[in-house]
Design a protein with these regions (language model features):
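Radical SAM enzyme core and accessory elements
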Residues: 1-13
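Conserved glycine-rich "GG(E/T)P / GGGxP" loop and the immediately following alpha-helix
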Residues: 13-145
Length: 145
């Protein structure tokens, strides 16, 4: 039996129905409100596509789509820095998973937007974190140059 096989946790009577996957370990910003601004940076690595596919398969083996169907890339990273990110979204689409995407927007490519337009049925949430429209304040907040 998979080590993932366990009852879904309950919190105030609600079952969690989302899995969070860190597809890469880095971010291109150092926002003052994020641990990335203060922690020792992790090595810049992206999850192998085969490992990602294995994780999706294991989740689907243990949980039905009604039990767990959403994947979030909402960790302290920028998911779009992963060169295989669109491939991972294609795997998720092919296996019927929904995804939640939070990005600082800096690495959104034409390839990604074209994919999202063609497959809107798998987008649960797509959020951009743009802390201000003022350029100086934006640089101060994000640590960008």
């Amino acid at each position: 039996m998979s080590e993932l096989a366990r009852p879904l946790p309950e919190f105030h009577g609600f079952n969690y129905r989302i899995a969070q996957i860190e597809n890469n370990t880095h971010c291109n910003y150092k926002c003052w409100f994020c641990p990335n601004a203060y922690d020792t940076p992790a090595p810049k690595e992206c999850m192998d596509l085969d490992l990602f596919a294995k994780i999706l398969t294991e989740i689907r083996t243990v949980y039905t789509p009604l039990e767990l169907n959403d994947i979030s890339f909402a960790t302290y990273n920028e998911p779009n820095l992963d060169d295989t990110f669109t491939d991972k979204l294609q795997l998720m689409t092919a296996t019927g998973f929904m995804y939640e995407h939070i990005s600082n927007g800096s690495m959104i490519t034409t390839e990604l937007t074209d994919f999202l337009i063609k497959h809107p049925q798998n987008i649960k949430n797509f959020r951009l974190n743009i802390p201000t429209l003022d350029e100086k304040k934006w640089k101060d907040i994000t640590g960008a140059s």
